[in-house]
Design a protein with these regions (language model features):
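Eukaryotic N-terminal low-complexity, Ser/Thr- and Lys/Arg-rich leader segments
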Residues: 1, 118, 177-180
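Exposed loop/turn and edge beta-strand positions of beta-sandwich/beta-sheet ligand-binding modules
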Residues: 2, 100, 137
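A conserved amphipathic terminal alpha-helix motif
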Residues: 141-180
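Hydrophobic pocket/interface hotspot
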Residues: 16-20, 26, 62, 137, ...
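Short, well-structured hydrophobic secondary-structure segments
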Residues: 57-65
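Short structural boundary motif marking the start of a folded domain
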Residues: 1-2, 131-133
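Hydrophobic ligand-binding cavity/cleft-lining segments
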Residues: 1-57
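Hydrophobic-ligand binding "helix-grip"
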Residues: 31, 35, 40-42, 65-132, ...
Length: 180
């Protein structure tokens, strides 16, 4: 299991969540992602979709291909989204991973600060210290083959922070493009 936390200033939870669920764009900006596409709805697992929509969450499935130095893996993920708080992707078909769950959580910095009893201050950039989003990213996985487990563990140490940075950069580039 690997996790990373980052404060992203000047962005909204909604904008960050939108980029995370835009799976069709992943190959253009996500490290280690060779291809990604939302699959046609008629191929989705009906029970998983029903469970998600019953909870008021969005649901879709996506095929992804990831590559890390010596190996690559194609798999399908079942994705649920509770906008704008959380996006969770669970691998439902993979040869390499027995299980893999990726979770993104987005919390307004002002909410996180008030939960911790912190007072609002200026951040030195002209923004209140509470203007931003706390992004928590977590990858929890179990590898089928013990031989591959050691290699995957080494690589995944860097994946969590690289993922957050890539998504933050994507959100900022989309925001700049929208301003033009």
């Amino acid at each position: 299991r690997y996790a990373a936390r980052k404060i992203v200033r000047g962005m909204t939870r909604e904008a960050l969540c939108d980029v995370v669920v835009d799976v069709d764009s992943y190959a253009s900006f996500v490290p280690f992602c060779a291809s990604a596409a939302v699959t046609p709805r008629e191929t989705w697992e009906v029970a998983r979709e029903r469970d998600a929509t019953t909870r008021g969450e969005e649901y879709f499935e996506a095929d992804l291909e990831i590559g890390f130095k010596v190996f690559s893996e194609r798999y399908t993920s079942a994705v649920t989204c509770a906008r704008p708080e959380r996006v969770t992707a669970r691998s439902v078909s993979s040869g390499l991973f027995k299980s893999m769950t990726t979770t993104w959580r987005f919390q307004n910095l002002s909410d996180a600060a008030s939960e911790e009893g912190e007072e609002e201050e200026d951040d030195g950039l002209g923004l209140p210290a509470s203007d931003g989003v706390v992004v928590d990213f977590e990858i929890d996985f179990e590898v089928n083959d013990p031989v591959h487990a050691a290699a995957v563990s080494v690589v995944f140490k860097d994946v969590a922070s690289a993922q957050i940075s890539a998504f933050e950069k994507r959100v900022r580039s989309l925001a700049l493009a929208a301003m033009r």
